[in-house]
Design a protein with these regions (language model features):
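PLP-dependent aminotransferase class I/II
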Residues: 10, 40-43, 48-54, 114, ...
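Histidine-centered beta-alpha loop that forms part of the nucleotide-sugar donor binding/catalytic region
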Residues: 83, 97, 104, 158-159, ...
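Hydrophobic faces of well-ordered beta-strands that scaffold small-molecule active sites
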Residues: 153-155, 177, 307, 339
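Conserved active-site segment immediately N-terminal to the catalytic lysine
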Residues: 155-189, 221-227
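Short beta-strand-to-turn element immediately C-terminal to the catalytic PLP-Schiff-base lysine
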Residues: 179-180, 193-200, 245
Length: 361
């Protein structure tokens, strides 16, 4: 039997291995105060996206939770898509808000600005767009809506590290832009997240978030410190930070490999409904839509190609179940399939995936 072609596969080199060894031997593995390599990673990422400030955390979920804690959403509404990983909605609930799920544009699977506009009420306080699969949302229209109604934009960029919008990196636009780092993500590390801040009060926001990232600890001098508010144990560890620093150096190159694969898929896969080819996209996911999804996935699995379903719509989960219909999202939730697009794919594997998708779709 052929070795299975993985849906995700991190691209790790010698530098990551060497840096891990240095951290291991140092005995300095974690820092709640965010010194050492964590601070270096924040500074390098800030340069990379061109933002005012960055706060590194231990996951994308933590990033969303902390970012939303910057604005008062208690008993207020936050508009977001239902087609996302469930932590996008969880972060709203954790901060006392109510998630309002709206539909997507079927061409991109990103939130539809027209549906945002229709869903605004006196209780609406924020918009939480998701750059689905690494495809940038229509930020211009979303920003216009936010300005018109005095709403805050918190972006979920868990898929979009290295993507661009208007010739600027994603992470350079919204008040707070939340990234996720994981072995399956474009920037791989054991686990991690980051908030990129773009605001005139970014220094004040950083001070607030540094305390909330480490159990509310503030005013630390040697072993003395104070706690003035609730916080969490959300800081990034040194192992993740050094891997992140190495990954950041080659991120654009690896994303270009993904784009080249996407270009081949776009030209040669005959499925009508698939993610558009766009040089701005980071292609964390390459999705197609098929009617006979279960059979299609089994057929590919039988010949050694791993696939995924990203995602079951959040409003269909038991915890969030809503009676209202979100038509494009629900259709996508039944038909969407993700196929391998990671940089470790060989040309023969890419050709095999294309041939197999065309055969069984």
């Amino acid at each position: 039997m052929k070795k299975k072609i993985k849906l995700f596969d991190p691209s790790i080199g010698q530098e990551e291995q060497e840096k891990i060894s240095v951290v291991l031997k140092s005995g300095f593995w974690a820092s709640g105060s965010g010194t050492g390599n964590v601070l270096k990673f924040e500074n390098e990422f800030k340069k990379y996206v061109g933002s005012n400030n960055c706060i590194a955390v231990n996951s994308g979920t933590s990033a969303l939770n902390l970012a939303l804690s910057l604005i008062d959403i208690k008993n207020k509404e936050v508009i977001l898509p239902s087609l996302s990983f469930v932590s996008t909605a969880h972060a709203v609930i954790i901060n006392g808000g109510t998630p309002v799920f709206v539909d997507i544009e079927p061409e991109t699977m990103c939130i539809d600005p027209n549906e945002i506009q229709k869903s605004i009420t006196p209780k609406t306080t924020a918009i939480l767009p998701v750059h689905f699969g690494g495809f940038p949302c229509n930020l211009k229209d979303i920003q216009n809506i936010a300005e018109k109604h005095n709403l805050t934009i918190i972006e979920d960029a868990a898929h979009a590290v290295g993507a661009t919008y208007n010739n600027k990196k994603i992470g350079n636009h919204g008040t707070a832009v939340c990234f996720s780092f994981h072995p399956v993500k474009n920037l791989a590390m054991p686990t991690g997240g980051l908030i990129s801040i773009n605001h005139k009060n970014h220094k004040q926001f950083r001070k607030i978030l540094l305390a909330r990232r480490w159990c509310g600890i503030t005013d630390r001098i040697d072993s003395k410190y104070d706690v003035k508010e609730l916080g969490w144990n959300y800081y990034m560890n040194e192992f993740s930070a050094v891997i992140g620093l190495a990954q950041l150096k080659k991120l654009d190159r690896l994303n270009n490999v993904r784009r080249n694969i996407a270009k081949s898929y776009d030209k040669e896969i005959y499925v009508e409904h698939k993610i558009p080819f766009d040089k701005r996209c980071s292609y964390h996911l390459y999705w197609i839509c098929v009617k006979n999804r279960n059979k299609f996935r089994k057929d590919l699995d039988d010949i050694g190609i791993e696939t995924g379903t990203h995602y079951k719509p959040i409003h269909k989960m038991s915890f969030y179940k809503k009676s209202n219909k979100i038509l494009n999202t629900e259709k996508a939730g039944k038909e969407i399939v993700t196929i391998p697009i990671h940089p470790n794919l060989t040309q023969s594997q890419i050709d095999y995936i294309i041939k197999s998708v065309n055969k069984f779709s």
